[in-house]
Amino acid sequence: MNGRIRQNQTAYNPYSTSGRNNRNTINSERDESENGSLLMNGSSSPPNNQQTNKAGFFKNMVSKLLSKPLQWMFSNFDESSSSSSSSSSSYDDGNNIPQKGSSTTTTNINNNNNNNNSNSNSNSNNNTNNQNNNSNNNNNNNNKINISDDYDSNLSKVKVPSGINFDTSSLSVADLTRSYQTNISNKNILDNKPILKKDQNPTTTTTTTTAAAVPKKSVAIGGVTNNDKKPTTTTTATTSILKTNINSLYPNLSQDRINANASTFNSSRNIKNNLSPTQTTLKITNNNTIYSNSQFKKKPISSTFNASPFESSIINSSSILSKRKQFDDNNNSNINDNQSIYNRQSIYSPNSKIEQPPLKKRLPNADGTDNSVMMATSQAAKRILEHLDSFSNPVLAHYNPSSTMAPSSQSLYNGNDSTYQPPTSVYRPKIKIPQISINYKYNPYGLSKLLEKKPKSNKDLGLEIPTNSITSSVSLYKKPLNKKSEDESTEPIKTYATPSTTTTTATVANTSSSSSSSSSSSSSSSSSSSSSSSSSSLFSSKPATISSNTTTTTTTSSPPSSSLFSTTSSAASTNTATASSLFSATPATTIATSSPSTSTSTSSSSSGNEKKLDNMFTSDSNKSNLFSKENDGGGVNPFKNLATTVSKTDFIGINGVSTSTSSSTSTSKSSPIAKKDITSINKSAPYEKKKRGLENEDTPLDVPGLKNIEPPSGLFNFSGIKPIETTLFSVSTTTPLATTTTASSSSSSSLFSSPPTTDKSSADKSSADKSSTDKSTSPVTTSIPSFTSSSTSTSLFGPTTTTTDKDSKTASIFSTKPTTEGLFSKPTTSLTSSSLFSSTITTATTTPSIFGDASKSSTSTSLFGSSNTTTAKPPASFGVNLSAAPKKSSPPPPPESDEEDEENEGDEGDEEGDENGELEAEEAFYVPPDSDEENEGDGNGGDLEAEEEFYVPPDSDEEKEKEKKPKTKQQSTQLTGLFAAPPKGGSLFGNTPTGGSLFGSAPTGSSLFSGGSLLTSSFLTKKGENDDDSSDEDSNKKRKKKRESSSSSSTSSNIIIPTTSKKEKIDDKPSTTTTTTTTSLFGSTTTSGLFSNPSTTSTGSLFSSNPLGSTASTSSLFGASTLASTATTTATPTTSLFGSTTPSSSSSSSSSSSSTTSTTTPSNSLFGTSSSSSSTSSSLFGSTTSATTPSSLFGTTTTSSDSKSETKTTPSLSSGGLFSTTSASPFSIPSSTSSSGLFGSTNQTESKVATTTTTAATTATPSTSLFGSTTTPSTSSSTSSLTTTPSTGLFGASSSTTPSTGLFGSATTPSTGLFGASSSSSSSSISSSSTTSTTTTPSTGLFGSTTPSTGLFGSTTTAATTTPSTGLFGSTPSSTTSTTTTPPNGLFGSTTPSTALFGTSTPATTSTLTTSTSTTPSTGLFGSSSSIATTTPSTGLFGSTSSSTTNTAPSTGLFGSTTTSTTATPFGSSSSTPSTGLFGSSSSSTSSSLSSSSTTATQPTGLFGSTAPSTGLFGSTTATNPSTGLFGSTTTTSTTTTPSTGLFGSSSSTPSSTGLFGSSSSTTSSTTTPSTGLFGSAAPSTSSPFSIPTSSTPATSNPFGSNPFPTSSPTTVSSTPSSNPFGAPSLSNSTSSSSLFGAPTTSTAATTTPSFGSSPFGAPSSTSSTPFGASPFGAPTSTSSPPFGAPTSASSTPFGAPQISTSSSTNLFGGASSSTAAPSFVSSPFGAPITSSSSSSSSSLPFGAPTTSSSSSTPFGASPFGNSMASTTSPFGAPAASPSPFGIQAASPSPFGAPAASPSPFGSTPSTAPNPFGNFGAVPANGFSLGKMGTSKKPAKKK
């Protein structure tokens, strides 16, 4: 599906049998359980503070699943089109007119055919959120069209509030003065033809704007609001059909009211609207103008009949459209805030002296002037509402006013935006409101009469222009939510008081079985297992209350969508509202420009009245919560959101200019950045040069506020932290990635951020700078993703480099000081660690690194080579120095012109000071090729020209580099690197002493990755004040700029900011050379490159460890392994990303004994863990095998250590680990009490000693973790306990008796998880009989549940289930005793014939495939591979591979049905009734002979025809009546009397057809008239190029025709098949041809089934192995292996729901079974697996709910996101004892997990276990290495 499901747009359902355009039918029930329908309204609007692409892994993964559900299947989805695509995301099946703009095709996945499913499922689970209750009956009705903000060229100046949605799905009335055509009017839809007349040629301009729309509360999976996509609102403005269509559409309109002659709308339009200037200005105010000043009509306007049959006083008195709550315009809050009222006063004001509001207003321009665009007001919509009263009255027959009693204390849209005063709530009764669309066929004048009515009070008010459609107006009235528990009240739905009512239907789970039912799509719902007032539902949240004293901004308000994935509402208000969601961070303040929008914010954080979030991931002031930590007080929160200041930051572009101001309450002195940095940011941008004409387009460079930038210091978080806070994914209150508030703290450690703390000496220096304006009181918050230094901060990605204060420790992974413990810095302690790309340093002379070790020996062995660094001064800049290498023989540079000065203006300030690590932002990785490289032909610099493909940016002029070339002659030693070049060479990876190679690292070289280049870290470091003197060659201007921008010297490594650094001259001051040792990305010479191994005085490189003699143990990116330590062992381990640099505690331990080394300090690496049992690991995923509990993310021990590196291990279960066993950690694994860990609670031991036997207490309540709760066994056996309450985790709960509402469903009981639930099992053993469940209610998981569910991918139906699932991919076949009578209608079908998208694989009642008695095939998209005895084929898209002999009706699939039979016809089976598939159906035939098929009378009308004559597109193959297909029909016998009139004619019959290309007339003499096709006809004697060859012309290869069927015997069959691309192929005796659509024959025998040779689209026969049947999209037969079809037996279809098979297959989505006893999902990534006691071990599904077998190693159940069992291998689940990549497993081989002794690619297992990454992780004991490094020497200090 090209594009994604945009906001308010429903997914396409190919099986909506109720009609895809009949919105009256589809939308007639806008009531309960809209959450039950999956992917219907995945709202794609991002929160205002969320960059779309800044999301993390899980959010990206899930949001792509939810918002672009099938783009990986159907189209070459361009990610860039996510914000600009105007294509409709509806799958056009020919019924819908192709719609430009944001067309809404209202379909329902939950098909009405499955009403019986919901009836049998409605009341069976009281504890589950009955999301599938009536889910099949209730279609999602949020039919809103996002009308673009710029339907006119004037709208570029219009302040239209972003996200205004006009729902014109039912009715699109053109603006009579403007006639912009939103999509297609109803008349067009009903008539299926455009309005345009023949002579019209409208220019249609489709403009797409992305606005920070208000996030809608919409139904996503299980109610997950997916608010991370910008809404793409598209308007197709048709500007030339107005003057010709206004009169035809509205014949009664007078021309004086409409200037129909104006083709474009301009301000000179003469409209007699008599509107005052204030009335014509569109105002977004807090007044309830949308409900006020409306005229009240006593009786509804009748549409077509005089007296409305419903105009009784009783009905009118309770009309839901005319009677509404009265609002007080003077009071902006709801009347009777704490009292439930259903005020029967009309929503309309009385028809009184109040001035009628205008029906249209002028939109204001951005500058405040009136725009020429007129916009219909809500008054026009109210007219339609009044008109529709008669339509809506009948629904009140069973109306109970008590059901609408709701207080106004809560509302659906709890917008926290300061502009959003609490609007008036509209109570809608909990009744069904019919969706009324004015049907021009049946109501041709009703709307026109309505529009032509003038207001009663004001004749001259002007023409009423109802822009809002009737549907949106009706859906404006929200019905109240369902009743909560006793202390909770029903929320009224708040609607935005804007002309475009943001309407989202808050559905109510219409359940009577449980009072705690959850409506996942509504803003608040009861928890499924408690009746407390805290709405702790997984996907819904408790709405936030808005304080009324908020600051008014113009940002669109984001209501707190407290759902699973939604972040909290962005509120400019400091009274941050509460919202609870799984990923809900703290109330993020409005980041005005975090997304492209026109909103601005001037919020102030002076009051600091912030309320606490109240769901399981956020907590009160003293609790540790998952994503937020409120106060300075207790709790270590990994995912803390630092909401201490409310700061408004503008997103900083590459030019680095921040235009925002901030009022911060932080008292910490922000670390000022020297002007040098700002100028380098602004002026070094390659496109900021005057040569490019862009110099003056942005903010002036010397903005005083910018001198005081507090740089962000962390990948995910930046400053703004007052307390010492340890956060995992901490984000500042200003959510944008590159945003930081201006606050710093003395010490704080977070996993992904380290709040920068200004070093006092550095701060004093920089404030003492000459031209510095650091005294600015309001530091501008900057969004530059750079890293500043802090004194003591430990963060994962926060490379807080230490400042000149050498005592400060910054344990960040990117830190590069020798004293720091950065992840990407290398340890400086000798023999204490090795890095990813360099192995153990065993001697003082060899530090081998595969990516180059810039050691000082001339024989350093590196992958990219390393240069001799003995005479080289280390380039002090960690940026890419991309200018050519300086050479001694370089001529003096020509004097710089002014253009050059401007061009290198940012560089000039840096050139003298680069030795101190000055970093320039001039280069992005894209390098503009505008430099003056004059010595490009030289051997050293020749290969770094700007012409190279690597985008080598010219640093500046080549001559400037050559000015700074060291005068000393470089030592030309031969390098021994893998790609090393000769000393003078300029090879790609070669390194000469003077550099010049791409990856070379010359001492002063200018190679791409050499040490003062690509990723210099000196951007935000302060430069020494003695740097001001520059070389004499420098101009005074440069020297002046340098003084202005010099900053104090420090060392910092930065990986994010690509900058260019100039090489210093040799004769610079010594202070610049001695104080800086910066790290380049891919290695410098003596400085530590990314892959190089620096000298002892150098800072750590990214991937290598420090050489010998170092004093600090800073490990590199992938960890330093345990090194034999002959030097002093540091007590503090290095913090490597994937490995733990576990320093040996023994001073004499060798590298071979690293597996027995005991360290006293755990490593703080991301995935690493310490390798010893006595040590603790605080790594992200690592845990140890020791009795202690590491305080890692998934660890199980607590490591308390102070800044002095003194570590104290606390072996308690209340650790700070992510999955610690106490409820103190949100990720903790529950012990006796169920904690709500992020990844569920795994089976953890109560004892202090971790044993292999997991003995955990029985948790009565599962944790509501992110991925569900892993079941806590009640016994010591990890496979015998089932919790009684499922968790509502993200991916559901693993097996428990009660289904959870997890994202992936729950185990054992059908849950409503995203991927369904794994099968329920009645036995206590997980590995034993898991198919004996008698669960009768399927789960509604995304991928279905084991029980038939309505999951996305169907459900794996368990035995004896009576209701199949309606999952996306259908449900997999139930086991051998299945008595399923109703097929599921999953996307890919189900085992029972379902209406799945891709059909279903029909079940077998026995273990064999040939005895199935399923009677109804599925109507999947690709048909269903129905079972053997099915009597009705499926109507899949590609037909159904219906079963054999007893099929009576073929399917009507897209490509027909391959209905098998006793005959072997080219298209499949002999069924009594052919199907009407797209490509026709294989004709039914009663004989088994190919040459003598006696087809039945009824022929299918497939696209390509059918075997029987049909009216297919390409005709049909033969029968008595030819088809009229596009390409005609390949008729066979001479008895055919009527040829087809296909596009390409028909293959012969007695009268030839008149196809486009004529008809290939038959060979019989009875054909008297050849066809008069475009290319003529193939007369019997002639062969037209396009005709279908006859038996007389067998060798003819027509493009479109095909050989007809043999008329007599197989011997007369043509020996050569035609290779026609489109036609139906002939049955030939030779090999198959490769026709595009046709199906060539493959056999020589007449009785064999012809195959679809290589036909991508045709529907194959049962014995073929063709792509389309076993076709990628067709429903394959039992022996085929199609990608998409649902295979029957041994096939390996990727998508279809697999058939129970005797052999295992590898389906992408389906689950093929591997045994006859019980089906299993063999390797289906997405399908929900079947629970099997025998073959479930071979299943490895990424997404499906896992099987309950303990031996199964499925990724997704034991799934990466599912709730894995205790012993399964789950990438993402956190099972207690499973080898899980991301789990917390201690002793398992896991790719990313950090088991203590496992061969982990990224783990830090230093043991002798085989390590896939070899030296990357902890090196093996033998010290694996790629080579030897030369002797390491100290870099020569130059003077």
Swiss-Prot record:
Bias-annotated ranges (Acidic residues): 896-923, 944-958
Protein name: Nuclear pore complex protein DDB_G0274915
Biased composition (Low complexity): 80-90, 102-148, 329-343, 495-568, 589-607, 658-671, 739-760, 774-803, 827-837, 846-871, 1005-1021, 1046-1060, 1071-1092, 1129-1242, 1250-1292, 1311-1384, 1397-1498, 1522-1673, 1712-1810
Coiled-coil residue windows: none
Pfam families assigned to the protein according to its UniProt record, in alphabetical order: Nucleoporin_FG
Composition-biased stretches (Basic and acidic residues): 761-773, 1061-1070
Location of the region described as Disordered in the Swiss-Prot/TrEMBL record: 1-54, 78-150, 325-367, 480-568, 589-636, 657-705, 739-810, 818-837, 846-1106, 1129-1839
